[in-house]
Design a protein with these regions (language model features):
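Generic structural motif
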Residues: 6-10, 57, 137
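Helix N-cap and loop-to-helix transition residues
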Residues: 32, 55, 109-111
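Glycine-rich phosphate-binding "P-loop"
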Residues: 51
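Activation targets extended, charge/polar-rich intrinsically disordered C-terminal tails
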Residues: 68-171
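Acidic/histidine-rich, surface-exposed loop or edge segments in extracytoplasmic proteins
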Residues: 39-48, 67-75
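Glycine-rich catalytic cores of cysteine/serine-nucleophile enzymes that process amide/ester linkages
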Residues: 1-45
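A structural motif
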Residues: 54-67
């Protein structure tokens, strides 16, 4: 089973305008793993696997929370590029339902890491877009907790995490 916090409805009236204004609801969806893989392959998207060293109790807490999030309006959230997106939802769960500590971050600003992200390469206007969407926030240095707001940044952050019992989070 795959839980996906990055689901949205393209049929939302004024989709692009609502996204730019920060008024777009995203939602949690669930699918069979094989269906998820086939959809990503069809769309030409990549998937990176990261195996986590979680206890049975941590897995159960997280799974129960995900199931509760699927109920009714719990599944919807107002998308925010930095503080509440499909990546931050995973990050928040990881630190809420495990005994792991957030590692230090050397990120200098939100803008630098968005513009330099591998999936943004070759898009010359991305800096302007970040300025328009984020305003002055784009030049702020994120806290260690905020630093995992993009998939690649969270992937790297998780790879460096150890739990309070000294076990590595990533197997």
């Amino acid at each position: 089973v795959v839980y996906n916090f990055g689901t949205f409805d393209f049929n939302t009236p004024n989709f692009l305008a609502e996204f730019v204004k920060g008024n777009l609801n995203y939602f949690l969806s669930v699918d069979y793993f094989q269906n998820f893989i086939l959809q990503y392959q069809y769309e030409g998207r990549s998937i990176k696997e990261q195996v986590l060293n979680l206890t049975a109790a941590e897995k159960l807490k997280w799974q129960n929370a995900l199931q509760k999030n699927l109920e009714g309006n719990n599944r919807y959230y107002l998308y925010n590029f930095i503080t509440d997106n499909c990546t931050t939802r995973v990050k928040d769960g990881l630190y809420q339902f495990t005994s792991n500590q957030v590692p230090a971050s050397d990120i200098k600003s939100f803008r630098v890491h968005v513009v330099e992200a591998p999936y943004q390469q070759g898009i010359p206007w991305i800096g302007l877009g970040i300025d328009l969407l984020l305003g002055a926030v784009s030049d702020e240095a994120p806290s260690p907790f905020q630093a995992g707001f993009l998939p690649d940044l969270l992937y790297d952050q998780i790879a460096s995490v150890s739990s309070t019992n000294s076990f590595r989070l990533v197997v």
